[in-house]
């Protein structure tokens, strides 16, 4: 997902910031329905639908971790509300990597980088 998919452009509220006037669910729902419906198990879909990041087991011993770097996009004014760790994604990433390390598994991280 790119930063221009949200509306207004660059606007990506976290789950905690969404309410009656702010929504990003339409985008996350569309991505899951159109692209990943058959590729993610229910738990992974639920994680993505909450804040746009997820992890999934690709094969035994290999986990894919997908980050939502849109939270860190400079134009995302929701950063003013939580600029240290939007949606606690970094905390979650640390937990995922620790879990993989403890199991002796590999983890591959994907995300979109902005230039």
PLM region descriptions:
Residues 74-84, 98-115:
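Active-site-proximal segments of metal-dependent phosphoesterases and phosphodiesterases across multiple
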Residues 1-95:
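Extended active-site neighborhood of metal-dependent phosphoesterases/phosphodiesterases
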């Amino acid at each position: 997902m790119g930063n221009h998919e949200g509306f207004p452009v660059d606007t990506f509220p976290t789950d905690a910031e969404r309410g009656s006037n702010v929504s990003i669910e339409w985008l996350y729902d569309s991505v899951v329905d159109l692209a990943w419906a058959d590729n993610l198990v229910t738990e992974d879909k639920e994680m993505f639908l909450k804040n746009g990041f997820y992890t999934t087991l690709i094969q035994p011993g290999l986990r894919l971790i997908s980050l939502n770097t849109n939270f860190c996009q400079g134009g995302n004014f929701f950063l003013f509300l939580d600029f240290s760790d939007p949606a606690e994604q970094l905390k979650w990433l640390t937990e995922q990597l620790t879990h993989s390390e403890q199991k002796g598994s590999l983890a591959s991280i994907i995300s979109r980088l902005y230039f």
